[in-house]
């Protein structure tokens, strides 16, 4: 079994790619990771690849949809990390899903960690440290007695429907600051 990371994608090449070219390069990287996984599990189906994930998640292996979803904003802002870490991370999930009892295994359990370490030669990190400000905008300003808060469109919509949020420090209900 191969225990080295996938070959690095040249940084300068990644930095110069347009969005469409970047997505195509990411699909190629998924193909390389899939070929690596097939060394140990030849029956592994090739995953579909979509760039429709939003919010703070960088990637998602989606068994029901039959493939991998990636956050296009985080991909654009963290190109090297995506190619070196995120794509192998999600492909490790894809492989574990397809093993016997894969759907019953913990997402970041022993099997996933083994794939990350022994197949991709990477530390089994569960979370990323990307700046998610552009990927997860919070344009709605709220205020309590002690500070301001930025709420996401989803939380703001819940407030409009009647949900209330309280400050964890002063316990006052947050109030929308229009404008």
Regions found by a protein language model. Name each.
Residues 2-81, 98-179:
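Metalloprotease/metallohydrolase-associated module, dominated by Zn2+-dependent proteases
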């Amino acid at each position: 079994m191969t225990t080295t990371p996938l070959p690095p994608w040249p940084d300068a090449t990644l930095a110069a790619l347009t969005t469409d070219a970047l997505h195509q390069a990411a699909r190629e990287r998924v193909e390389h990771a899939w070929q690596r996984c097939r060394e140990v599990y030849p029956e592994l189906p090739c995953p579909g690849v979509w760039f429709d994930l939003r919010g703070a998640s960088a990637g998602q292996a989606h068994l029901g949809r039959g493939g991998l979803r990636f956050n296009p904003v985080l991909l654009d802002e963290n190109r090297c990390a995506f190619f070196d870490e995120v794509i192998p991370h999600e492909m490790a999930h894809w492989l574990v899903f397809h093993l016997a009892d894969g759907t019953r295994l913990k997402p970041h359990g022993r099997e996933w960690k083994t794939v990350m370490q022994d197949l991709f030669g990477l530390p089994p990190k569960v979370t990323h440290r990307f700046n998610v400000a552009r990927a997860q905008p919070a344009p709605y300003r709220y205020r309590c007695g002690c500070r301001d808060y930025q709420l996401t469109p989803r939380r703001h919509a819940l407030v409009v429907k009647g949900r209330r949020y309280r400050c964890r420090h002063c316990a006052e209900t947050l109030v929308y600051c229009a404008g």
